[in-house]
Amino acid sequence: MNWKAVLIFSVLGSLASCASYSEHAVQRIEAGKSFAVTGNTKRINTMACQDNDDWYLDGYRVGKSFREHQQKMLSQRTAYCEEQTGKAVPDKFRHSWNSGYQQGLKR
Protein backbone atom coordinates (compact mmCIF):
# COMPACT_ATOMS: atom_id res chain seq x y z
CA MET A 1 0.00 0.00 0.00
CA ASN A 2 1.41 3.39 -0.90
CA TRP A 3 1.38 6.50 1.25
CA LYS A 4 -1.62 8.01 -0.61
CA ALA A 5 -3.81 5.02 0.18
CA VAL A 6 -2.73 5.12 3.83
CA LEU A 7 -3.53 8.83 4.00
CA ILE A 8 -6.97 8.34 2.43
CA PHE A 9 -7.87 5.50 4.81
CA SER A 10 -6.66 7.53 7.79
CA VAL A 11 -8.78 10.53 6.81
CA LEU A 12 -11.85 8.37 6.14
CA GLY A 13 -11.41 6.61 9.48
CA SER A 14 -11.17 9.93 11.28
CA LEU A 15 -14.27 11.28 9.56
CA ALA A 16 -16.26 8.15 10.38
CA SER A 17 -15.42 8.48 14.07
CA CYS A 18 -16.52 12.12 14.04
CA ALA A 19 -20.04 11.36 12.86
CA SER A 20 -22.50 13.72 14.50
CA TYR A 21 -24.65 12.51 17.37
CA SER A 22 -28.40 12.84 16.97
CA GLU A 23 -30.12 14.43 19.97
CA HIS A 24 -32.74 11.67 19.97
CA ALA A 25 -30.44 8.75 19.16
CA VAL A 26 -31.09 5.78 21.40
CA GLN A 27 -28.11 4.79 23.49
CA ARG A 28 -27.56 1.09 24.19
CA ILE A 29 -28.40 0.45 27.84
CA GLU A 30 -27.40 -2.61 29.84
CA ALA A 31 -29.07 -3.87 33.01
CA GLY A 32 -27.41 -2.62 36.19
CA LYS A 33 -25.03 -0.32 34.30
CA SER A 34 -24.97 3.46 34.28
CA PHE A 35 -25.87 5.35 31.13
CA ALA A 36 -25.46 8.97 30.09
CA VAL A 37 -28.30 11.47 30.30
CA THR A 38 -26.12 14.47 29.52
CA GLY A 39 -22.40 14.96 29.11
CA ASN A 40 -21.91 15.04 32.88
CA THR A 41 -24.98 13.25 34.31
CA LYS A 42 -25.52 9.51 34.42
CA ARG A 43 -28.33 7.29 35.66
CA ILE A 44 -28.12 3.69 36.78
CA ASN A 45 -30.37 1.30 34.93
CA THR A 46 -32.70 -0.39 37.40
CA MET A 47 -35.63 -0.64 35.00
CA ALA A 48 -38.37 -3.16 35.65
CA CYS A 49 -39.84 -3.42 32.17
CA GLN A 50 -43.11 -5.14 33.13
CA ASP A 51 -43.86 -3.01 36.21
CA ASN A 52 -46.41 -0.25 35.61
CA ASP A 53 -45.42 1.58 38.82
CA ASP A 54 -41.77 1.60 37.76
CA TRP A 55 -42.74 3.27 34.48
CA TYR A 56 -44.68 5.94 36.40
CA LEU A 57 -41.85 6.59 38.86
CA ASP A 58 -39.28 6.81 36.07
CA GLY A 59 -41.44 9.36 34.23
CA TYR A 60 -41.83 11.32 37.47
CA ARG A 61 -38.07 11.42 38.01
CA VAL A 62 -37.44 12.55 34.43
CA GLY A 63 -40.11 15.26 34.75
CA LYS A 64 -38.62 16.48 38.00
CA SER A 65 -34.92 16.38 37.15
CA PHE A 66 -34.35 15.81 33.42
CA ARG A 67 -37.34 17.52 31.76
CA GLU A 68 -35.32 18.77 28.78
CA HIS A 69 -34.48 15.14 27.95
CA GLN A 70 -38.05 13.81 27.97
CA GLN A 71 -38.07 12.25 24.51
CA LYS A 72 -34.55 10.85 24.80
CA MET A 73 -35.23 9.19 28.16
CA LEU A 74 -38.54 7.65 27.09
CA SER A 75 -36.96 6.41 23.85
CA GLN A 76 -34.06 4.84 25.76
CA ARG A 77 -36.37 3.07 28.19
CA THR A 78 -38.69 1.86 25.43
CA ALA A 79 -35.80 0.52 23.31
CA TYR A 80 -34.24 -1.22 26.32
CA CYS A 81 -37.49 -2.89 27.37
CA GLU A 82 -38.36 -3.95 23.82
CA GLU A 83 -34.92 -5.54 23.54
CA GLN A 84 -35.24 -7.27 26.92
CA THR A 85 -38.76 -8.62 26.39
CA GLY A 86 -38.68 -9.14 22.63
CA LYS A 87 -42.08 -7.40 22.42
CA ALA A 88 -43.40 -3.92 21.81
CA VAL A 89 -43.98 -1.90 24.96
CA PRO A 90 -47.71 -1.82 25.81
CA ASP A 91 -49.39 1.60 25.62
CA LYS A 92 -50.37 1.40 29.31
CA PHE A 93 -46.67 1.63 30.27
CA ARG A 94 -46.07 4.68 28.06
CA HIS A 95 -49.24 6.25 29.50
CA SER A 96 -47.98 5.64 33.05
CA TRP A 97 -44.58 7.11 32.17
CA ASN A 98 -46.21 10.24 30.70
CA SER A 99 -48.53 10.59 33.73
CA GLY A 100 -45.51 10.42 36.04
CA TYR A 101 -43.64 12.88 33.85
CA GLN A 102 -46.49 15.40 34.07
CA GLN A 103 -46.56 15.08 37.88
CA GLY A 104 -42.79 15.51 38.02
CA LEU A 105 -43.08 18.77 36.10
CA LYS A 106 -45.30 20.16 38.86
CA ARG A 107 -42.70 19.57 41.58
Swiss-Prot record:
This is Uncharacterized lipoprotein PM1897. A lipid is attached at residue 18 (N-palmitoyl cysteine). Residues 1-17 form the signal peptide. It is a lipid-anchor. One of its GO terms (cellular component) is plasma membrane. It is found in: Cell membrane. It comes from the Bacteria. The keyword Signal applies. Keywords: Cell membrane, Lipoprotein, Membrane, Palmitate, Signal. A lipid is attached at residue 18 (S-diacylglycerol cysteine). Transmembrane segments: none annotated. Its main location: membrane. The keyword Lipoprotein applies.
